[in-house]
């Protein structure tokens, strides 16, 4: 399956909105999270796995029926989401990724970090 950066972002936003101290997020076949409705169950589960492998989320408990329980975003996940939360920053990040011809999560995280760094630098000029 191809990595869909928009799906990753929507998953991270959904996890942030639905977790907290002592509160995990359950993702099941019939889940009704607004941002995830446009993706198939398999697509979301694949991208949850990619988020876990990339250390963006913590403690994913997987069950035999394909559902899972997610504890929270990791510190790295919070940082990445902070960098891409703004639609403007996200669209710029995706545009640069497309221009350079990459869709890897590592590259997208690096591009997002640089987009933010350039915005900060511009404030000092």
Task: Map each language-model feature to its residues.
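Generic structural signal for hydrophobic core residues of well-folded globular domains
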Residues: 15-18, 51, 81-84
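Non-catalytic, well-ordered alpha-helical scaffold segments
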Residues: 5-9, 45, 71, 75-78
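N-terminal intrinsically disordered, cationic/polar leader segments
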Residues: 29-32, 50, 111
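Short, amphipathic alpha-helical interaction segments positioned at domain boundaries
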Residues: 69-97
């Amino acid at each position: 399956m191809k990595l869909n950066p928009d799906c990753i972002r929507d998953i991270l936003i959904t996890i942030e909105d639905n977790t907290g101290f002592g509160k995990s997020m359950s993702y099941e076949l019939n889940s009704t999270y607004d941002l995830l409705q446009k993706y198939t169950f398999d697509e979301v589960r694949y991208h949850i796995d990619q988020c876990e492998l990339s250390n963006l989320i913590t403690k994913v408990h997987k069950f035999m029926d394909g559902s899972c329980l997610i504890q929270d975003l990791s510190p790295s996940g919070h940082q990445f989401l902070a960098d891409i939360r703004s639609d403007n920053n996200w669209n710029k990040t995706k545009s640069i990724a497309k221009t350079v011809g990459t869709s890897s999560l590592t590259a997208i995280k690096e591009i997002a970090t640089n987009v933010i760094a350039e915005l900060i630098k511009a404030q000092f000029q």
